[in-house]
Structure formats: structure tokens, C-alpha cells
Amino acid sequence: MARAGRPGRVALSCFSWLKAAAARRGRLRLAARVILLDPDGRVLLMRYDDGPPNGSHWTTPGGGLNEAEDYRAAALRELAEETGWSDIALLGEVARRRLIMEYGGRLVLQRERLYLARTDQACREIRGVDAMHAADGIAAWRWWTLAELDATRETVWPAGLADLIRNALGQA
């Protein structure tokens, strides 16, 4: 790392260094996620029990892009794979984020896009989540209100999800 004050050199932040290291090693992962709201404005989250370092956390349905797949197609495919629902339309992209995370036992730079979608069915059920997703680490799923997201002490990704949803809906 460069010393401060040397002309033409910039000290890298920890995130910048990790990002550069992941990119140099070809460990870039593209991903798409869906913020799915029910008629009552609750958001669907899946709980993953990954063990260290990610631990137990809640996140929106989604995952990595397949080769030659675009973000929107990946978002819809992942939603269908994780819920069994293929009748959901995306309303639009609401956020992009970059993060360093462990995936498949290695450090990766993940670039993901988050899409907003709605279902018109209240309390829509996911069938067979235990059998279908145990191998993927999905331990549970539930619909959360924004107030529950604000109050929870559990880990929810992305951080600030309730505010992201409020902003997307113009309720900020």
C-alpha cells in the first residue's frame, strides 16, 4: 500500500483494496434480487443459516446471474426457483449495490441490482421450501412489515431495507 503524501499514489481504503483483490482474481459475481411486496405492503424475506462468516441472516429472494443472462431475467428466474411463483412482474430497478462477501468458500466482489415487485395475493404460501432449499441454506421465509424491519435485532440484508422500500414507494 502506498505511503500517504507520495506524489501520484493514493492510499486505498480497506474496501477498495478488497474490491481490487477480488477483481484481480476474477471473483466477480453478478446478482439480482427481488423486493417482493404483498397487498399489505409486507416484504418477503428468506432466512439463511450459512454459519461463519455470514451467520444467520434474512434477505430478499435472488441470486447470481447465469452466463449470458441479464439482471431482470435473473431476478425473475431466482424468484421462481426460490418461491415457485412465475407470475410476478418486476416494477422496476430500485437500487444497485456492490459488496465484498464470502460465497462458495471464497471472497467475491458482488454487484447486484434490486428490483421492486408486487403480488396481489395476501399471505401467499411457498410450497416445499424445506425440501427444495435446504441445500441452498434457506432455513425459513416470512412476510415482514416495514415496522418489523425497523425494530428487528436480526441481521437483514441489505441494511436499511425498510428505508429503501419507503424511498422506492415515495414514502420517505
PLM ranges: what are they?
Residues 56-63:
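Conserved acetyl-CoA binding element of GNAT-fold acetyltransferases
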Residues 42-43:
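Entry beta-strands of beta-propeller and related beta-repeat scaffolds
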Residues 52-56, 109:
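A conserved beta-turn-beta hairpin within the catalytic core of GNAT-like acetyltransferases
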Residues 153-172:
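Charged phosphate-binding loop/patch that engages nucleotide di/tri-phosphates or the phosphate backbone
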